[in-house]
Amino acid sequence: MTDVQNDPDRVIHPLRRDRATGEFERVSWEAAIADIGARLRRTIAATGPNSVGWYFGNPGAFSYSHALWVKGFMEGLGSPHYYTASSQDVANRFAASALLYGSPALVPIPDLHRTSFLLMVGANPFVSHGSVLTAPKIKEQLHGIVERGGRVVVVDPRRSETARHFEHVPVRPDTDAWMLLSMLCVLVEEHLADEASLARETTGWARVRELALGFPPEETAARTGVPADELRRLARDLAGADRAAVYGRTGSCLGRFGTLVSFLLDTLMLATGNLDRAGGGVFGLPAIALDEVAQQAGLDTYGKVRSRLGGFPDVLGALPASLLAEEMTTPGDGQIRAFFTSAGNPVLSCPDGPALEQALEGLDLYVSLDIYVNETNRHADYILPSTTWLERDDLPI
């Protein structure tokens, strides 16, 4: 972090871009804010408040004030054009939580300290250091499961940096849903599901049970690449473990069936009696109760707002960022004409970056809040320097 904090390339003064030359020059905060305000007011007067859009990237999610104030700003304007990095890697996880628990902010995390069996699907914490969970020294924690007699099984098409250290089940890309349904099928067929717990804690299990029975491992093996006998053993071992957790991350969210996969990951824990249980998937106690804050801030939503193009649902208030370029170039009420980004680089991280890059040049106003010049904000009219975590009050979320 010292390298970032003191990086000579870091943006520490407001920068204004000359559209004719593309060059940035240093300006005062007063000049930048005055011009941004005037141009934003002109755009809103001409095309309405719903012509303003905002995208914030992954680092912004780790600052409680940033997330709340960005959404508050957009709510104050009355614009639905709120986008985040979540639609690239985790929105379907949140959507599954909304369907299962009634809130997209309720996400179970593996109890690494107490589990005896960890099944990871599409996760590579040796590189990511964990995602949607906070686990300091996660490598040591994972090895600790094995050292105390437990198992860590990594389901991934690639023998990832994490998979090399533990048991690896290679699965064909985008077939996780078939594999997980087959595991549920085994639990039902062999009477390994905790039916009493399911009857007590869930509604709709009968429909899931019936669905799962249509995916026996012998019929899905050709699609998933996982031999039927191996998958049956895996399902039995999961059910037979003293305390088991199932954890999916980015890889499990990037296929065509990401929401279903996230739903099935939690259903496996439900079916084996390991959801909301020590050593299983637990709902943590963060410094900030995210589900309560999200509800109070009006972010605890799924499908409350639909996108102008395609009618796609919001997740936690955010629309799919893959729509940005089209929303900027498609005429009509609600076309984005003024745009803000913060802590993000959607040209690099979102689908069809070249189209977005071209669309940015046609805006009336583009303002970026960041600590670096990047592939996206090099098209901005202004780059306003932001803080690192060492320079502001914050709480870990």
Where are these predicted regions, by residue range?
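N-terminal export/assembly segments and adjacent metallocofactor-ligating motifs
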Residues: 1-190, 227
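Gly-rich Lys/Arg/Thr-decorated short loops/hinges at beta-loop-alpha junctions or inter-strand turns
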Residues: 10-21, 118-124, 208-219, 303-309, ...
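N-terminal leader/propeptide and maturation segments of large enzyme subunits in energy/redox metabolism
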Residues: 15-26, 185, 189-228
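Generic, well-ordered alpha-helical scaffold segments in large soluble proteins
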Residues: 35, 39-43, 72-76, 145-148, ...
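Flexible, glycine/charged-enriched surface loops at secondary-structure junctions
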Residues: 47-51, 193-198, 245, 276-283
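A cross-kingdom feature strongest in bacterial/archaeal respiratory oxidoreductases
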Residues: 51, 117-164, 172, 305-397
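Conserved short loop/turn motifs at secondary-structure junctions
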Residues: 55-62, 223-226, 249-256, 288, ...
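A glycine-rich, hydrophobic/aromatic-adjacent loop/helix-cap motif
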Residues: 229, 238-333
